Design a protein with these regions (language model features):
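Secondary-structure capping and domain/repeat boundary segments
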Residues: 1-194
Length: 194
């Protein structure tokens, strides 16, 4: 019998490997797993985190899938926000600017002559929200009383009215045998705050 002679060629068969990029978002959400063929383009995920600005990755995400599994972590910077105080005619209060999520110490109440502070139009949060906010003071006008000591003359009813309102002077008191010469101090045109 004849021996077979001749060359045989063998071709290698390849299957492309898949690798994984594990993205740790560091925002309280689950890891993002990107598994794909070696050499294929990688699209980095877009991440958000309330109160923070995304600053990039702890190491570069390659443009195409490498021949290794890799893990990257998101890098975040905390944002600052401001609470402004519209005191609505009251004493000035400096705005509070601080990091998101930090404890807020409410300022002292504003003051306003002739008024009582009744609070803010919305609650001051316990921790800094992820937004700038403005709160507005709410006021109630005070009432004051002017009393008259007629020093032996006819009685005059005290005047009680809101701060800043126009005062109508009372009729002069009378006293038998005397002529009224006026009050020891001038009656103001508008109700004072004291």
């Amino acid at each position: 019998g004849g021996a077979e002679t001749g060359n045989k060629e063998y071709w290698a068969k390849w299957e492309i490997n898949q690798y994984t990029v594990t993205v740790k978002p560091e925002n309280g959400k689950a890891d993002i797993i990107i598994t794909q063929d070696y050499g294929t383009p990688i699209t980095a995920p877009t991440l958000t985190r309330e109160g923070y600005t995304f600053k990039g990755w702890d190491k570069e995400i390659p443009e195409t899938m490498p021949a290794d599994n890799i893990t990257v972590k998101a890098q975040w910077e905390i944002n600052q926000y401001t609470i402004a105080f519209d005191t609505n005619g009251g004493s000035e209060i400096t705005p509070i600017t601080q990091d998101y999520g930090t404890k807020i110490t409410a300022p002292d109440k504003p003051t306003r002559k002739g008024y009582t502070f009744k609070g803010w139009d919305k609650e001051i949060p316990e921790t800094m929200p992820a937004d700038n906010i403005t709160v507005k003071a709410q006021w109630e006008i005070n009432q004051y009383t002017i009393a008259f000591d007629t020093n032996g003359g006819s009685e005059i009813t005290p005047i009680t009215q809101d701060y800043g309102t126009k005062i109508t002077a009372p009729d002069k008191p009378t006293r038998k045998g005397y002529t009224f010469k006026g009050w020891d101090k001038e009656i103001p045109e508008t109700m004072p705050a004291d």
